[in-house]
Design a protein with these regions (language model features):
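Short coil/turn connectors between adjacent alpha-helices in alpha-solenoid helical repeat scaffolds
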Residues: 75, 79, 120-131, 174-176
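Short, mixed-charge aromatic SLiMs
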Residues: 132-152
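Helix-turn-helix repeat elements of alpha-solenoid scaffolds
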Residues: 79-90, 130-137, 177-180
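Long, charge-rich alpha-helical interaction segments
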Residues: 149-187
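A non-transmembrane, solvent-exposed segment enriched in polar/low-complexity residues
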Residues: 1-104, 109, 118
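Structural motif
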Residues: 94-113, 149-161
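Residues that form generic nucleotide/phosphate-binding pockets
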Residues: 87, 91, 113, 141-145, ...
């Protein structure tokens, strides 16, 4: 089945949830966005607009982070993640969009997507505190400055889940290593 989506009152990011994942799209007046159900999965078809083509490129880049836990070691994720971060940074620098607000939102959205993927991976797979993620450049940067007070996290469809997984990780693997005040715990 192919169906058109509504026309929004204002341009911005919109999400369609199919029960498994969120499909992100950027819709502005006059855009026609169509989704088609294929074997139980929804796929955006007839991608229109520069913004949606860039979102689709990002979605394809992000696929490289998918791991097969049965055949790949836990630590194999982190070099792959750090490599994708470098690739994304280059891609964002080279990508020029006419809509500067969208360009800013794209960068923020990608940062939060990477953060969510990283924290989710650790939360699901880490077995001990002394673990491979600590060798990741992103991990070292993240632990010192997690954006817990950044309201933009809650603008993402996974915002609450991201905060929950981060605090569970800190409580399980970081806080128990020493005495911390509540403020230290939040930092």
């Amino acid at each position: 089945h192919l169906f058109p989506l509504f026309q929004p009152a204002e341009a911005g990011f919109y999400y369609l949830y199919d029960g498994k994942e969120y499909h992100r799209m950027y819709i502005k007046a006059g855009d026609e966005i169509h989704f088609q159900g294929i074997d139980g999965d929804w796929k955006q078809v007839d991608i229109t607009g520069e913004e949606n083509r860039l979102l689709e490129q990002w979605k394809e880049m992000k696929r490289s982070l998918k791991m097969d836990a049965r055949t790949e070691a836990y630590g194999a994720y982190f070099p792959r993640f750090d490599s994708l971060r470098l690739e994304v940074d280059r891609w964002l620098q080279e990508t020029v969009v006419r809509d500067s607000l969208f360009q800013k939102q794209l960068k923020e959205t990608i940062e939060f997507d990477l953060l969510y993927d990283f924290i989710s991976y650790i939360a699901k797979n880490q077995q001990s505190y002394e673990s491979e993620e600590q060798r990741s450049a992103y991990y070292r940067q993240l632990i010192g400055r997690f954006p817990v007070e950044d309201g933009r996290i809650l603008q993402q469809p996974y915002g609450i889940q991201l905060l929950r997984e981060y605090f569970n990780y800190k409580r399980t693997f970081v806080i128990r290593q020493g005495e911390y005040s509540f403020d230290d715990w939040l930092a």
